[in-house]
């Protein structure tokens, strides 16, 4: 029991720290300078109380620490989601040591991204950042609310003096010494009711005081007078909505209603709990029975599933091989078609007589060209021989002239 109380107190302390941390971050305008810049969602009030998503919470924790360190004027590399958590935690502890914050925990405590250690670190950094930013705090101002008399407050504020009549009747049985005190009390009550009588246009009570004093001596007349004015004796108390007495009375009323309704609700909840428990036990027993009956079939299904997977894998392999062979076959067939077209084209060209005629024309042309070339060669040889003969004759003439001067 004591351990449960301690856990509850610790949980309440963490909730308070988380709420206080969020308020400080709002004072530092983290929604504009941090969330909007990195396109992040706003934090809930108890985001760092319990670890629900350690990866995301650790990244958010390191990002807020980095932002607060910037506010404090400390240099720290902005953490990324893929960074080593141990390195980032070590850097945070190093910065805590630089600002003289005692560190009595291991770095791996920060890797969870939530819990009392992370809350303490963020609380210290946010407090220091608020001091550096010189955030001003103002005294809480409670706006004056309009005075009103609600239904509930009217019932409690309007005092109908029925109890006073009973008390006066009981006091009438006492000795005569108490009569003077009762008369004095009655004068005070008449004095309280005096403004209402004046406002209604009744006779002024000051003029009737001697008559009332005379009638006070008679006990019976005193009671008749009391019965006459008793319905008009109402005291209105101005109620304040912030009065702690009103809150206590409301709390007591609510507590009474809760206690009255809790018995019925508790009985119904116990009945539902017993029904749910019985149904769950039936479902569990039925599940066990079905598992025992279906166990051989499940085992057979597993074996057939494995065999089916093997066959499907082999089928996929054969299908891939068939696709490859089909592609190769298509290529061979295309090549065959090309060869066939080329052979048909060549056969058609060979069977046609135009090629033979072209060959004959080419041969005849070659013969003409050969005869022309032979003629040109003969002419060249003749010209060459003639030139040689002319030179020989000129040489002989020159020799003869030299011998016969």
Curated annotation (Swiss-Prot):
It is found in: Cytoplasm, Cytoskeleton, Cilium basal body. The keyword Cytoplasm applies. The keyword Ion transport does not apply. One of its GO terms (biological process) is regulation of apoptotic process. InterPro entries: Intra-flagellar_transport_57 (IPR019530). Keywords: Cell projection, Cilium, Coiled coil, Cytoplasm, Cytoskeleton. Pfam families: IFT57. GO terms for cellular component: ciliary basal body; cilium; Golgi apparatus; intraciliary transport particle B; microtubule organizing center. Residues 252-380 form a coiled coil. It comes from the Eukaryota. Required for the formation of cilia. Belongs to the IFT57 family. This is Intraflagellar transport protein 57 homolog. It comes from Drosophila melanogaster. The gene is IFT57.
């Amino acid at each position: 029991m004591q351990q449960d109380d301690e856990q509850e107190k610790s949980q309440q302390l963490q909730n308070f720290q988380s709420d206080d941390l969020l308020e400080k971050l709002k004072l530092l305008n983290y929604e504009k300078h941090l969330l909007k810049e990195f396109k992040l969602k706003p934090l809930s009030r108890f985001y760092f109380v319990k670890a629900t998503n350690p990866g995301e919470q650790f990244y958010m924790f390191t990002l807020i620490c980095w932002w607060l360190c910037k506010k404090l004027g400390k240099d720290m590399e902005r953490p990324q989601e893929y960074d080593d958590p141990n390195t980032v935690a070590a850097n945070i502890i190093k910065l805590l040591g630089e600002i003289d914050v005692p560190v009595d925990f291991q770095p791996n405590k920060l890797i969870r991204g939530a819990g009392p250690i992370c809350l303490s670190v963020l609380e210290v950094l946010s407090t220091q950042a608020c001091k550096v930013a010189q955030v001003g705090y103002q005294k809480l101002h409670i706006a004056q609310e309009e005075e009103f008399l609600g239904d509930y407050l009217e019932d409690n504020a309007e005092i109908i003096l029925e109890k006073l009549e009973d008390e006066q009747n009981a006091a009438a049985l006492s000795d005569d010494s108490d009569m003077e005190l009762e008369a004095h009390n009655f004068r005070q009550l008449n004095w309280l009711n005096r403004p209402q009588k004046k406002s209604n246009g009744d006779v002024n009570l000051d003029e009737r005081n001697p008559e009332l004093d005379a009638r006070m001596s008679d006990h019976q007349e005193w009671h008749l007078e009391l019965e006459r004015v008793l319905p008009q004796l109402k005291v209105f108390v101005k109620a304040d909505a912030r009065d702690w007495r009103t809150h206590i009375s409301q709390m007591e009323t609510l507590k009474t209603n809760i206690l009255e309704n809790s018995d019925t609700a508790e009985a119904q909840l116990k009945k539902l709990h017993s029904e749910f428990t019985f149904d769950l036990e039936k479902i569990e027993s039925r599940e066990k029975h079905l598992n025992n009956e279906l166990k051989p079939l499940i085992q057979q299904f597993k074996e057939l599933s494995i065999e089916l997977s093997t066959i499907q894998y082999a089928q996929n392999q054969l299908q891939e091989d068939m696709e490859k062979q089909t592609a190769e076959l298509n290529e061979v067939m295309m090549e065959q078609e090309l060869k066939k077209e080329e052979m048909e084209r060549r056969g058609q060209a060979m069977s046609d007589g135009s090629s033979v005629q072209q060959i004959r024309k080419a041969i005849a042309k070659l013969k003409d060209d050969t005869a022309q070339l032979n003629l040109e060669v003969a002419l060249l040889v003749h010209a060459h021989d003639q030139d040689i003969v002319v030179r020989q004759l000129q040489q002989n003439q020159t020799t003869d002239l030299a011998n016969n001067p």
